[in-house]
Amino acid sequence: MKEYRLTDWLPTTKKEVELRGWDELDVILFSGDAYVDHPSFGAAVIGRILEAEGLKVAIIPQPNWRDDLRDFRKLGRPRLFFGISAGSMDSMVNKYTANKRLRSEDAYTPDGRPDMRPEYPSIVYSQILKRLYPDVPVILGSIEASLRRLSHYDYWQDKVQKSILCDSGADLLIYGMGEKPIVELTRKMKELLPAEDASLTAGELKKIAGTIPQTAYLCRATEWTPAADDIQLYSHEECLADKKKQASNFRHIEEESNKYAASRITQEVDNKVVVVNPPYPPMSQEELDHSYDLPYTRLPHPKYKGKRIPAYDMIKFSVNIHRGCFGGCAFCTISAHQGKFIVSRSKKSILNEVKEVMQLPDFKGYLSDLGGPSANMYQMKGKDEAICKKCKRPSCIHPKVCPNLNSDHCPLLDIYKAVDAIPGIKKSFIGSGVRYDLLLHQSKDAATNRSTAEYTRELIVNHVSGRLKVAPEHTSDRVLSIMRKPSFEQFETFKKIFDRINREENLRQQLIPYFISSHPGCKEEDMAELAVITKRLDFHLEQVQDFTPTPMTVATEAWYSGFHPYTLEPVFSAKTQREKLAQRQFFFWYKPEERKNILNELRRIGRQDLIDKLYGKRNK
């Protein structure tokens, strides 16, 4: 087990800054999460990236915004900027359930305390810093800011909100994975400094704001000159007046997010213009390795000694092997934030991190996950990448697997076997969700098909901790098409394979399917049929959720506007509490307390034929 000193973490207090012998800081980061020095926690990654650039960086985790604001003053003014991360989750998803009830636990806070971050920390922290230090640049990052960079529907306010740049007063927003833009930003900032001991002002930042990819900023409409190839969205005011325009905007936003080479996007709001610069091309393997190979302690800061951080407990024995997801699910923000192009770490970097994990206290030889946004997309990309560079499809596997996709599972099998061969590793489990549509896909390449069959058996026999998570999400092909998910028949086919391999290997593992109710396009009748089908398959569902509209997804825009952003055709969504509960109850057809309501609902919608299938003829 490694021994660490306090100075092995980035400083969080004046005393820790002084322990390093520093008398000033270049960058001060504020985070809505506790400080865990681990590559799964965004503030730690950005802090370490900036440290590797030779900057003096401190992190102030979960500052108190309700007192005399001493946490915002205690380290003074940085030379370059304040950086703000609301945390690893959108703060409103973190604080509220799909029914807008306050959650009792915050997984990213010591002992799960639910009161250590405000709603919208991106706005609250930024406004405080602008009040205290009006001329110091404030840079927003994290998923909360990233997905609110343009006009967006906010479920908790139940209205279309302006770009978060408007309400926060921040000077610049970095969207997506922030390593490349933050490095370029700081390098250009340093070039602007007139002397070694000088500080940068917000006014000086404006000189370079338009030159940094993957950032967004505000400027006065009178100062803005659009380029011919800019994509000019409907203004915020037009979107407020016409829901169809808000839906139409989203198609452009998503398509540009999924392009290899995107256009600049602009949107007018309040006599200003939000300018969203195109993203960087995907990171190289070397760049991703660099981010993960930085000197993380992989531990919570010592200030939390004796306290449990639930989110850390979940991932402390896991290793992330790639970024990006080309699934393009309509309700998911991963591709909007990480992109659809897969960037994979090298085998050497992964194995080095596994060896680091093995040094952690309490490690007993079991890795909880070797995965990413999806379990089985490692090193997958286009056979001809020139085709990918012209493509704007949101998904490489829906409605069908792209013929240009190389779905070879051999590189992933090689990683699993190399990890399991390390002395001291007893078992590596796969906790990420498995895309069974990739496992069932029949490529024109026989070797690829053999690798897929081998991977399927290897996964089920050696990497399941008793239960394998998969996400069919629904049984209705119509709803699944809106979700951009494969037909439920594919899940049934995969279940047969799973059950057969379990019989052959004398295993007693469970397949755990995840389902969503109240998704746009889903009606009570669809949920009733879901209940009948899952009963036939002998599932008593546990992993279920109501659809929660979160910013910057196709499903959210359809839910709010009533129109599908790509077709502008009307889409039904369950919105009232009664409509949502009427759908949700069908997950639990097997519970005696739900039976009466379900029977009444089936009669109300004229589907008495399903009563026999759920409960038998005597209940008609």
Swiss-Prot record:
It comes from the Bacteria. Disulfide bonds: none annotated. [4Fe-4S] cluster binds at C325, C329, C332. The keyword Iron-sulfur applies. SMART domains: Elp3. Its cofactor is [4Fe-4S] cluster. Binds 1 [4Fe-4S] cluster. The cluster is coordinated with 3 cysteines and an exchangeable S-adenosyl-L-methionine. PANTHER family: UPF0313 PROTEIN YGIQ. Belongs to the UPF0313 family. This is UPF0313 protein BT_0254.
